[in-house]
Amino acid sequence: MTTAIMPGCESFSATNGPLGVLVLHGFSGNPASMRSLAESIADAGYSVELPRLPGHGTTLEDMMTTTWADWSRTAEEAFDSLSERCDRVGVVGLSMGGGLSAHIAEVRPRVSACVLINPIVKPPGEEMIEGLTALLDAGVETIDAIGSDIKKEGAIEASYDATPLECVASLFEAMIDVNANLGTITAPTLLLSSREDHVVTSDNGDDVVSMVKGPVERVWLENSYHVATMDNDLELVESATIEFLDRILKS
């Protein structure tokens, strides 16, 4: 039986011409958090794919059956689909979607531009890994939810009410390779960093700046928390993203 998708959390697709953009949502989130940005990119004339990653936008139990292998495969397939019908393709991602975007730029040389929004691109420190391992060894399956880190009053992210630890472990393990290969990314990259982020530490963005081989532009978001695509700086996120994509993909 197919697991029902939460209302408003469906994938989004738009076909507008020979320039494409893949948009990727974050861990335990869903396309709803990226819908406004994806629609704005489409309105700017781009063909857009915003896939719902496996286990997301459905139920916590559904997510607990998935790993990085499932999420990255879906992202890669969406990029390949865009590449088949577009001359140039960029990737845009929030949080884990930023990590997935970096991963795609590492394994798909056709990536022409990257926009990383509060991305996770490195594993956490030893202390957090030890704590995670201890919880898993003790049979703990979930911890408190990490969604809705949003400064804007009244804004709520549609996400799960708990965080599955096996999925967290899978994400952290994948970040070892993503981080090690940041130096293979040659595509121009726009990094959007919230000054105050309670989910992803700022050293993730610092690694993008110091390790990515191609040119990196960093824009600080002064009035948003982690889910910047639903926060006070949404207008800046959209305008900076589209200006960057126009400058790189249309050149």
PLM feature segments, named:
Residues 3-59:
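Short, surface-exposed "cap/lid" segments of acyl-processing enzymes
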Residues 37, 187, 201-210:
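Short alpha-helix in the alpha/beta-hydrolase fold that links the catalytic acid
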Residues 47, 206-227:
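Catalytic histidine neighborhood in serine/cysteine hydrolases
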Residues 59-85, 90:
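Catalytic nucleophile-loop/oxyanion-hole region of alpha/beta-hydrolase
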Residues 93-97, 101:
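Gly/Ala-rich beta-loop-alpha elbow adjacent to hydrolase catalytic centers
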Residues 115-125:
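Active-site nucleophile loop of the alpha/beta-hydrolase fold
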Residues 184-185, 191-193, 197:
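Short beta-strand/loop motif that positions the catalytic acidic residue
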Residues 223-251:
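Catalytic active-site module of serine/aspartate enzymes centered on a nucleophile-bearing elbow/loop
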